[in-house]
Amino acid sequence: MDSQRNLFLIAFLFVSFMIWQAWQTDNAPQPLQTQTTQNTTSAAGDAVNQGVPASGQGKTITVKTDVLSLNINTRGGDIDQAQLLTYPDKLGSDQPFLLLESTPGFLYQAQSGLTGRNGPDNPANGARPLYTSGQDHFELANGQGELRIPLTFTAENGVTYTKTFVLKRGEYAIGVDYQINNTTQQPLEVSMFGQLKQTIDLPKHRDTGSSNFALHTFRGAAYSSSETNYEKYKFDTIRDNENLSTTTNNGWVAMLQQYFATAWVPQTAGSNTLYTSNLGNGVAAIGYKSAPVIVAAGSQQQLAATLWVGPEIQDKMAAVAPHLDLTVDYGWLWFISQPLFKLLKFLHGFIGNWGFSIIVITFIVRGIMYPLTKAQYTSMAKMRMLQPKIQAMRERLGDDKQRMSQEMMALYKAEKVNPLGGCLPLVIQMPIFLALYYMLMGSVELRHAPFALWIHDLAAQDPYYILPILMGVTMFFIQKMSPTTVTDPMQQKIMTFMPVIFTVFFLWFPSGLVLYYIVSNLVTILQQQLIYRGLEKRGLHSRDKKKA
């Protein structure tokens, strides 16, 4: 049992270190810049409207659906602000979560337009197009399923550009459609682009304010192309002018943060160039630019894209574009976290409470692992039975480690005992534990999800540290109920303090994760008693003695 505990402590410390290291890799603090970064254009060239003077501010058009509140600037038709109406900014707040923002302290915009030789957003024009609209406010009415916001711009040559935003009830995917009416006698060449730009360094009002690593996930850019399903792109990489430039026939670009994302998905057939760019002043951009489209004289042409602005809801994102659901950051154990989440969501559909769903999933996992757990305790019981022989062997062979090792292996073989048999369930539990951690920290469905009593957010730490203390108590009982062969006083002290060490580690872990571990420990206590009864009948265990 002592080797099992030592392995468990080492494995847990290793997992904790890996969590910390993963956070450091993706979310290391970024130094504040005091001077403007040199503006380096990506290979996409004029796809980015960098440094183009506004030539006067446009009007703000407000748009409201049942889930979104947007501010659209008629200068370029960019979305300057987006609020998620069904997601509060903080637990207990009546303020909706602010995703896109255009203020002096922070910039996060979703831009789109038509560039290229004849595009109205071509930097050579000196200004973004100034659109007009028939009204300043659009709102989705009761019973209405779709809301359309048409913006119109007529160029000096008479060409009319209509930019229409299409929003649907309950949806975070926004259609952005362009209709080009070429009334001239000459063909036009345009390219559609979609771009996300954001201030790299977070101001205080955008920061979570958390000082512990357990509450951070990746914040930065990401993209998908024909060559790669999903690739992160750090803001620091863009700041260092190491820019992305790749051509693909499909894909998307995105900016990510914990629980929420924005993404541009091109919908027009043909190739697109995906790019990143350092826009200067501490602002990074990621976007796409379509291949040139020729609009014949006297004809019309339509171009389209989809903009995702909202929570990272996996099934809805997957319906918008292939692999867009991969933006949910489940870390390197995504292949375990995703099935766990699907099972958890399935259970929640019946139970209606995420906390009780976690309890049920714990019973399911431990039930599946019961044969391994039984084998683990049986192996440890056999190892305890061999302790007198092993101790006699140590006294007889002294410091001859090589011979000691050989005779011990021969003894294990003769007695049909696997010395590592007690470790397998622990090895299996560690990835499940870590995958559950990633699932809790990456699934927006668990953000602000209440359980019971004082636990109002399963994805956040217990504010009163009651669950971690209960977890430590269950570990203490497991330790006291488990036979041990430890005789060294120092090792005994270490074993005694293990529940305390684990309790301290769990203080800052998500409540849902601690809940899982408490229930898992309670199941361990129950299974332990059932298994020990069977071992007693086989003469492999005695309740009267704690030491073999």
From Swiss-Prot:
* Membrane-crossing residue ranges in chain numbering: 6-26, 345-365, 420-440, 458-478, 499-519
Report residue spans for region: Disordered: 30-53
Q: Which domain of life is it from?
A: Bacteria
Q: GO terms for molecular function, please?
A: membrane insertase activity
Q: Could you tell me which cysteines form disulfide bridges?
A: none
Q: What keywords tag this UniProt record?
A: Cell inner membrane, Cell membrane, Chaperone, Membrane, Protein transport, Transmembrane, Transmembrane helix, Transport
Kindly state the subunit structure of this protein: Interacts with the Sec translocase complex via SecD. Specifically interacts with transmembrane segments of nascent integral membrane proteins during membrane integration.
Summarizing the function annotation, the protein's role is: Required for the insertion and/or proper folding and/or complex formation of integral membrane proteins into the membrane. Involved in integration of membrane proteins that insert both dependently and independently of the Sec translocase complex, as well as at least some lipoproteins. Aids folding of multispanning membrane proteins.
Q: What's the protein called, per UniProt?
A: Membrane protein insertase YidC
The organism named in the record is Erwinia tasmaniensis (strain DSM 17950 / CFBP 7177 / CIP 109463 / NCPPB 4357 / Et1/99)
